[in-house]
């Protein structure tokens, strides 16, 4: 059973996050291992496994990029283990330039430039994210998979920039 079905939700990218949260809480209560403490060893093990599945499904569906990757996996795209890389050379060059810029910002310890950089990367991410949403809605799986690969780069870059921001603030 896929995670969407497990949570009683349609298998699509855009979902009702409130319904997801409520269903998660219901499933947690229903299958919490403590409820099976007096049960047989097999029942206890099954409860622990079910609880782990609930938590994994919850983590996957609540995180937008993970949810997109999971939805694509249901359509034959195993992005988590695939060896496909982004073949868009212009995008890759842009990523290299952005990484170099982030390194320069770190060397200069330039907080104002870093703030501007983070905003720019967030805007780039948001633009591509919206494109991905449209591609998934239109079931353009190949295009969506390519966009998700690019979003991974941007997500890592954003994370690196935010870590640098914390480092500079602690300095």
From Swiss-Prot:
Keywords annotated in UniProt: Chaperone
Database matches in HAMAP family: HscB (MF_00682)
Domain J stretches: 2-74
Homology family: Belongs to the HscB family.
GO biological process entries: [2Fe-2S] cluster assembly; protein complex oligomerization; protein folding
The protein's name in its UniProt record: Co-chaperone protein HscB
Cellular component GO terms, alphabetical: iron-sulfur cluster transfer complex
Keyword Secreted among record annotations: no
GO molecular function annotations of the record: ATPase activator activity; protein-folding chaperone binding
Record note on quaternary structure: Interacts with HscA and stimulates its ATPase activity. Interacts with IscU.
Function: Co-chaperone involved in the maturation of iron-sulfur cluster-containing proteins. Seems to help targeting proteins to be folded toward HscA.
